[in-house]
């Protein structure tokens, strides 16, 4: 009778089986919840005894057959959902299954290796024994991090600071789209810095500050695998992982290069939108600068067609080049090369005019100086002639006497007459001489 009650009311747990001693069904009208405490204790003892027999009985021992008793069979226990690797090592290539990555998209199915410098970051679960972050995992990328002010300062002190880890380090959000990967990797790098792993992050030249250890590489691989599901990775990331599924450092290095390229793209767009040209620099240098910017943007996936490029160039023209806005802006099929032909023509014309007119092209200040020098130069001419007069001419009375004698003596030689006429004649009114007839 006791065995029949055990078969009806005893619980089954964790691989232990309590089977009935008879194959006949026992029908009873007793309430299954109305069980005495003594019977419950007996059932628990029987269950404990069955568990102990399961663990102590070797696998090769023979179990006697009993037609009225079912032999206990150990139930297949699934592997722990959140437990780390037993050997504390990385997943092998066969376990990771790099071709299909069957476990990759399910963080709860991945064994997570603990890391001594950082806390564990498991998805929330009822049996987890590590710090949980239910409000952080899967949050949007725009959510600010509480430890945003804590940055990695000195990588050399990472070895001496093995035990002084922050109590709570916010993990990165879950990646939900390939387009969000550039923003996600920034938060992942911030997460590594807050976990005292800033020294292993590649710098601008692509090399880390210090060499990464095996444990750090394991931590890097597991965290990247958990928070970046494979279906949301960009194509270039999948290409890297298809060659080496643990090469997370190469992904970080390429991501930093792309960040720098994005910064260069932004600078090129700003430069192209704020172009200025007035002929002060050679047209060849201006053309080279603009074409290099357009080529870089086109190579990075930002396509600048001829119409947009010509509009941006013409908007920055000034001076004699400004009229190109109004002469060519209606040409729909104008190319950048055609626009620069016009710019070169104006620049060469400017250079030719400057080289051919260097002497008579004067400023207003030069003209003022020339006018002042002209008034002063006329006076020395007058002054230069006065000494010549005083030295070469006689007194006024002598010259007047010579004139009177020359008029009264017709027999004078022609040479003396011609000589006297060439000299300047000055008359004095005291001799009562008048040159104009009819004035006396």
UniProtKB/Swiss-Prot annotation:
InterPro entries: TYA. Residues 1-23, 48-60, 127-152, 419-428 have a biased composition (Polar residues). Keywords: Cytoplasm, Phosphoprotein, RNA-binding, Transposable element. Residues 153-165, 402-418 have a biased composition (Low complexity). GO terms for biological process: viral translational frameshifting. GO terms for cellular component: cytoplasm. The C-terminal RNA-binding region of CA is sufficient for all its nucleocapsid-like chaperone activities. Residues 1-93, 126-173, 352-440 are annotated as: Disordered. The modification Phosphoserine is found at residue 416. The record marks 401-402 as: Cleavage. Its main location: cytoplasm. Residues 299-401 are annotated as: RNA-binding. It comes from Saccharomyces cerevisiae (strain ATCC 204508 / S288c). GO terms for molecular function: RNA binding. It is found in: Cytoplasm. This is Transposon Ty1-PR3 Gag polyprotein. Retrotransposons are mobile genetic entities that are able to replicate via an RNA intermediate and a reverse transcription step. In contrast to retroviruses, retrotransposons are non-infectious, lack an envelope and remain intracellular. Ty1 retrotransposons belong to the copia elements (pseudoviridae). Homotrimer. Induction: Ty1-PR3 is a weakly expressed element. Induced under amino acid starvation conditions by GCN4. Residues 429-440 have a biased composition (Basic and acidic residues). Capsid protein (CA) is the structural component of the virus-like particle (VLP), forming the shell that encapsulates the retrotransposons dimeric RNA genome. The particles are assembled from trimer-clustered units and there are holes in the capsid shells that allow for the diffusion of macromolecules. CA also has nucleocapsid-like chaperone activity, promoting primer tRNA(i)-Met annealing to the multipartite primer-binding site (PBS), dimerization of Ty1 RNA and initiation of reverse transcription.
